[in-house]
A protein has these predicted regions:
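Catalytic binding pocket for nucleotide-activated donors in carbohydrate/polymer assembly enzymes
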Residues: 119, 260-340
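A nucleotide-sugar donor-handling region in carbohydrate enzymes
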Residues: 118-188, 212-213, 331-335
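A donor-sugar binding/catalytic signature common to diverse glycosyltransferases
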Residues: 80-82, 95-100, 239-287
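Short hydrophobic signal-anchor/transmembrane segments that target glycosyltransferases
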Residues: 20-23, 189-205
Length: 359
């Protein structure tokens, strides 16, 4: 039996890992452990620990980060799977096979920068990105597709119905999923228009984990919590509800900004509105080049499958238009899904585990 550690740097990495965990468990010759770096707040850790308890997976923790790292080193794992570089070089032995399933596929340059020579296999979500990384000199690539999206195919209809029931979604209304990034974000400028949107639609708000967990973005969950309390058709998903996949499956339309969600929603072949109305930090308003240097502008310029708005006042009209013309951009979305996501057949995790076993 090979020992596998999923080093889950943040809670929102777990949906990327879950299909890989399920595939490893099916093959029956792996012992799986999960861990998360120690932080001042144990909230994320407690949520993930509970998730692991339900599935019978051992969660590795300790009183301090140093103790946790020492525990991991003593376990001497055969395989370590990460979502970013993080503590990789401290926890991986020289004999361990290190696999990266990167946590996001959005519009930030970190996709190309957050890498380390210690990674033996990097799961890549598309042919285009595979060739791009290869041109940069990376030779540790496995073309798999995006593992997170496997459950768009494998999640049972029963689970989808449970999601609708849990939120008490009005079946007579279309459902809008609003899934903004934490920064830069459209939240400040879009939220004032959500109550009016909620008059004729179910509105589900799925915030980024940092909107709950980092103090400087905490105002975002406060703002959205107030909206949810005051409007019966606006449903804010709690921090514990960190898995967005079930909500992709009940949504008729997605609103986002620079989040990976604009790519993740493509297999649903439903309208996507990209709200390009951000409130930038003062330093980025003054030194704009510093901000745009963190963005993948070439990737943004290639996006031709979303309805794009630069002013929040245009949101309501665009939602109504998109819902009345659901198929208008269908061919763009289908082509984009093939370009940005390789195969969306529910087997990305199978291809990754095959690559691990063949390494």
């Amino acid at each position: 039996m090979k020992k596998v550690l999923f080093e889950t740097h943040h809670l929102y990495y777990w949906p990327n890992f879950l299909p890989v965990v399920e595939e490893l468990l099916k093959r029956e010759n792996y012992v799986i452990n999960v861990s998360m770096p120690k932080r001042s707040s144990s909230f994320q850790e407690n949520i993930l620990n509970n998730v692991c308890s339900v599935t019978g997976i051992l969660f590795i923790t300790a009183n301090t980060e140093e103790e946790r790292i020492n525990k991991i080193i003593k376990e001497d794992y055969d395989i370590i799977i990460v979502g970013n570089v993080g503590q990789l070089n401290q926890i991986a032995s020289s004999d361990a096979l290190v696999v990266m399933v990167y946590h996001g596929i959005g519009l930030k340059q970190s996709y190309y920068n957050d890498i380390d020579e210690r990674v033996d296999i990097r799961s890549v979500e598309s042919v285009a990105r595979f060739n791009e990384l290869k041109d940069y000199g990376h030779g540790n690539l496995a073309l798999t597709g995006f593992t997170k999206l496997d459950r768009l195919v494998t999640l049972a209809n029963e689970s989808i119905n449970e999601t609708r029931t849990k939120l008490q979604i009005d079946p007579s209304k279309k459902t809008v999923l609003y899934a903004p990034s934490f920064y830069p974000t459209s939240i400040d400028r879009v939220c004032p228009f959500l109550p009016e949107l909620g008059q004729d639609h179910n509105v589900i708000i799925k915030l980024h984990g940092f909107s709950w967990e980092q103090k400087k973005y905490h105002y975002q969950n406060i703002l959205c919590s107030e909206l949810s309390k005051e409007n019966e058709n606006i449903h804010l998903l709690a921090n514990e509800d960190f898995d967005i996949i079930p909500y992709y499956l009940v949504a008729d339309i997605l609103i986002s900004d620079i989040s990976s969600t604009i790519f993740e929603f493509l297999p649903r072949d439903k309208p996507i509105i990209q709200a390009q109305c951000y409130n930038l930090k003062l330093k980025h308003r003054i030194f704009k080049r510093r901000f745009w240097g963190k963005m993948d502008l070439e990737r943004q310029d290639s996006v031709d499958f979303t309805y794009q708005i630069s002013e929040p006042e245009d949101l309501l009209g665009m939602v109504y238009y998109a819902i009345d013309n659901m198929d208008e951009m269908s061919s763009n979305r289908i082509e984009a899904s093939e370009f940005y996501l390789y195969e969306t057949d529910g087997k990305a995790s199978t291809r990754l585990v095959d690559a691990i076993e063949n390494h």
